[in-house]
């Protein structure tokens, strides 16, 4: 069933993540959109994804490595990665957490 609306607070999403015991948890799916909260511990081990991806930084600072580039980030920044592009977070602070939005068809738009 399609949702008419959905809301989360950062605290609610963080609590769900803590309960999961994982570095990420999927909070919502509808159509091609998937919303997650992601909080790696120590090292970011993610691999390229099949869909386009948007990050919105919740907390923390660090370096975003993507497509041969290195970009400093901090709370409130928005980062885009096309499907299939290797990327990772490095040198991130212990409080680092980000929203993740996957969307579109596999292979990207």
Name every feature range the model reports, one short phrase each.
Residues 29-31, 65-69, 92:
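Short strand-coil-strand connectors
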Residues 84-109:
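Ligand-binding loop in jelly-roll beta-barrel domains
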Residues 43-44, 79, 83-88:
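Histidine-centered metal-chelating micro-motifs
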Residues 1-37, 42-47:
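A short, N-terminal "cap"/entry segment at the start of jelly-roll beta-barrel domains
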Residues 68-83:
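Short acidic-glycine-tyrosine-enriched beta hairpin
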Residues 49-64:
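Short, conserved beta-strand element in jelly-roll/cupin
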Residues 35-37, 64, 98:
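Short hydrophobic/aromatic-rich beta-strand segments that constitute the beta-sheet cores
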């Amino acid at each position: 069933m399609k949702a008419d609306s959905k809301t989360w607070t950062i605290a609610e999403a963080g609590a769900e993540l803590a309960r999961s015991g994982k570095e990420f948890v999927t909070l919502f799916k509808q159509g091609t959109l998937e919303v997650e909260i992601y909080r790696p511990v120590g090292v970011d081990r993610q691999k390229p994804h099949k869909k386009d991806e948007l990050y919105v930084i919740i907390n923390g600072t660090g370096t975003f490595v993507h497509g041969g580039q290195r970009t400093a980030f901090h709370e409130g920044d928005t980062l885009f990665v096309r499907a299939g592009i290797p990327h990772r977070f490095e040198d991130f602070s212990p409080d680092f957490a980000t929203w993740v939005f996957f969307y579109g068809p596999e292979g990207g738009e």
